[in-house]
Amino acid sequence: GEPSIVPAIVSSPSEPNWLRGLGGPLRGFVEYVTATAPSPQPLLALGAGLTAFGAIAGRRYAGPTDLRTNLYCIGIADSGGGKDYPLKSAASLIVEAGMHHVLGGAKIASGPALITSLKKQPNILYTIDEIGFLLSAAANRLRSPKYILEIMDNMTEFYSMSDSKYLGTDYADQEERPREVIEQPCLCMFGVTTPNVFWSSLSSGNVGDGSLARMIILESENNYPD
């Protein structure tokens, strides 16, 4: 008969050295996600855990310098490399903790939509697949419409206002469009994308406007065959 085809066996990556420095629930989450993933991605699991716990702890804790728990993490891995599992795990953690209200939508339609979400829920986690396309559109000031550009602008402003108050924008008709004021906004975001899409989405403008400096970039150390 025809010889059987044996699928390639991909060994699980050994425990990275940085994982030994983690403790508490964060370490437990990263270890669990890495151990149960079909294609383990420890660095992406770290990003998922940091942002999920950051949203849960949002507006409750501050560091000695008043640093807050709002984080933007971008997980980068090849297509089919296991980036979806940490993304779903971050959302699952929020749901299993009974904090559905902390979980934002799978997509952000506009800058004003982001403001509305944080007005309703000041500590919130967005888990966004293929975030590279969103970042590319939000950074393209020559071609993208204003409501898309405002996504990145608002993300940058919310990040800086996490220890104070977001004062919003005054409009001419303040009865129809009242100013949105948000006390100590804690916006957390974990997105995943592929290397080509992410790096091609960046420009010198991202460095100049400070948006890139507010992101923790976690590029996979583990590649898996398709």
Where are these regions (language model features)?
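Phosphate-handling catalytic cores of nucleic-acid transaction enzymes
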Residues: G1-D226
